[in-house]
Amino acid sequence: MFQFQKTLSLALTLTLGIFLATTSVTAQAQAAAGKTELLWLGQAGFKIKTPGGKTIVIDPWLTGGPKTPAPYKTDIAALGKVDLLLVTHAHVDHIGDAPAIAKAQNTVLYGPADMVTPLITLGILPANLGHRFNKTGHVTPLPGIKVTAVQAEHSSLLVHNNPATGKNESHPAGEAVGYIIQMENGFKIWHM
């Protein structure tokens, strides 16, 4: 009986070892097939390079951000081509330079519906460069990349300098969202 248990234990150990080795090789092969690069831009801002070579930028408060790394603090063009621009809510430390990036690159800004609408209405963002997300809605803005808006508990107020009066105005900008971003290889990032 003892010999049988010893043999069974050895067989299970070998099977587990082979399984783990195979799993490790599979994970390494998947990683080699494409990696996701993540660069912190300060505050809640990130630049993501997908396995397919696309660039996603989230919450780009660059020129006003105290922790923005050089050269992005003084030159938003340093981001390179932005394929997807996401904003979680209208506070300046999140929306930051997003409208300027959208206009400079003719890239659509994706954000909560009640944030994008006043951006367009106030003339901050051209209508063709704003995409309104509903919470729990998802889109596939780029081939192989899926973005899902998820609930986030935070306020959202758009402060805009009115060019006619030179004064700041506050505008309600709906509820904040987070994003689950699924890359071409299935890897997911949850940004809140």
Spans of features found by a protein language model:
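Zn-dependent metallo-beta-lactamase
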Residues: F2-T13, G17-T55, L62-G64, K146-H154, ...
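Short active-site oxyanion
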Residues: T36-E37, K103-V108, K188-I189
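Active-site beta-strand termini and strand-to-loop segments that position acidic
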Residues: I48-P51, P141-P143, I181-N185
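Pre-active-site segment of Zn-dependent metallo-hydrolases
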Residues: T50-H91, G96-K103, P126, S156-P172
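Switch II (G3) loop of P-loop NTPases
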Residues: W61, H191-M192
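Short internal beta-strands
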Residues: L84, T107-D114
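Portal/gating segments that form or line small-molecule/metal binding sites
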Residues: V116, L122-Q151
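Active-site-proximal loop/helix segment associated with metal-binding centers of metalloenzymes
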Residues: A149-K188
